Amino acid sequence: MPPLQGRRSPQNLDRTASPLPRLPGLRNHPLTSQAPPDHARSDPHGPLRATHHHPCRFGGPPWKVTTITPEFTPADRRAALNRAARLRQLSETDRDAIRIAQDPKFTRWLEQITAIGGCSHPVHLSGSTTTLDGTTGEILQHYDTRTEPGERLLVRCRNRRATVCAPCSRLHAGDTYHLVRAGLLGGKNVPATIRDRPRLFVTLTAPSFGPVHGAGERCRPRRDRAECDHGRPLGCAAVHDATDPLVGQPVCADCYDYTGHVLWHAHASKLWDRFVIDVRRRLASSVGLVQSRFAQHARLSFARVAEYQKRAAVHVHAVVRLDGPNGPDDEPPAWGTAELLIGAVRASARRVLVRTSHSPAVGELVLRWGTQIDARPLHTNGDGPDDDAVAAYVAKYVTKGASETGAGTDHPLTNWGDIESAPVSEHVRTLMRTCWHLGGIPEYQPLRLRAWAHTLGYRGHILTKSRAYSTTYAALRAERAHHMGHADYPDAITERHWRYVGSGHTPGAAFMATGIADDLATAREAAREADSSTRGALGTR
């Protein structure tokens, strides 16, 4: 095809051409001051540019693209060339945002993005759901994605990490707060009487794998100038700030037990399970019960969260509660007191251990909890930790990924090169290398250390709870859907046919989704401040 004539340079563009569309959710963007988009135009990239967007990158098949036809007048041809030149001056993100904004189904696309809170990495689904009356077979409700933009529905990614998806992590933190709080104060089908039962806030730490630099006071003061076997000073007279990169780093990396650190992480979940079992046994023994009959008299409920310390070692915070044999609905026995529970927790934390598999390269290690054990009772009279503060702390931490705490990355490491290029400290990198090395030893194959090198060998969930502690994430999501007005047909039959067709955003879609998420966050903060002001005004009356 011969080249089109009449192309103008950017300096000689027709400035009277149609303005660029306004983008939603981004008040300060230079394009937002322009006129609204012309929805009659279905060409997102201009009449000279055809687009072939992969369905996994954005909304399915490309929108209809208008091409230059022989019926176009010279003025139409000039306008098309001018518009194409103007678009080429913009970034890929801006061009893609204009393409989306000029689509006829742009309003519905905005509704989907707003409904998922501006999710940063939505899942794209295609299919249908039909709800039928269980008796007559009458269709009560039907939904199909064929009428949606790109013939697909966008749903939340539900990632808990704020570094991956801030909107979904904020929602997950809110669910976690209500889950933990319900187990402390009641609510969500948990009776309010649990607030008067024995409840503890427990902290268990990892053991020492070698001296590390600390923050606050003088780091490691010594009167002598002793050195380790590798010729490095054993002391450190500096006062490190909390943001000092040295905080958490070994005083001597050659003396540090990296193997023990990684293997302790790999067995931390098993160590917690044995701790819970031993607490039950000690409670039974302390009141003269046969250990196997403890479940007939009481039940131990808990919710625990794992947190990385500055030294990149996991420690555990847990809410522990003593109930009757049927859980929250039963009162605990008369002998069940907070003091008795504290004694059992401390004794079990010092006693339980896990032995690693014997390896000719490493031998057999005995793994225990660290010596720093804290168990504080939770009271309703304000003496001790506040219930809401405990729930808020746990909820805040579940949104943090390994990369945010500086103790790993949020994505798996598939080869040695990934470890060497990871944006982490040398201490964390050495832990990753140790995971990779130990993962090649046959005796440690079941631990899958290479697959979990990005979390330094720790394989457990960030938040775990016992079955009877409180509600569940699924129940909270169902309650939220009901609150949003989703119809519930208890006696109906639902037929679902869905398939995964992609995930994520194109550059322009990500740009607008971020703006929508920011606007929603600002609106929530304004509503929270208004609610606080209203409560304060009512309190002064």
Model region roles, listed by residue range:
Residues L48, H53-A173, W369-R541:
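Long, low-complexity, charged/polar intrinsically disordered accessory regions
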Residues R8, R27-P30, S169-H172:
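Cys/His-rich microdomains that often coordinate metals
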Residues L13-P19, A35-P36, D175-L184:
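Short cysteine/histidine-rich zinc-coordinating motifs and their immediately flanking basic loops
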Residues S169-R170, G174, A182-K310:
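Signature for HUH/AEP ssDNA processing cores
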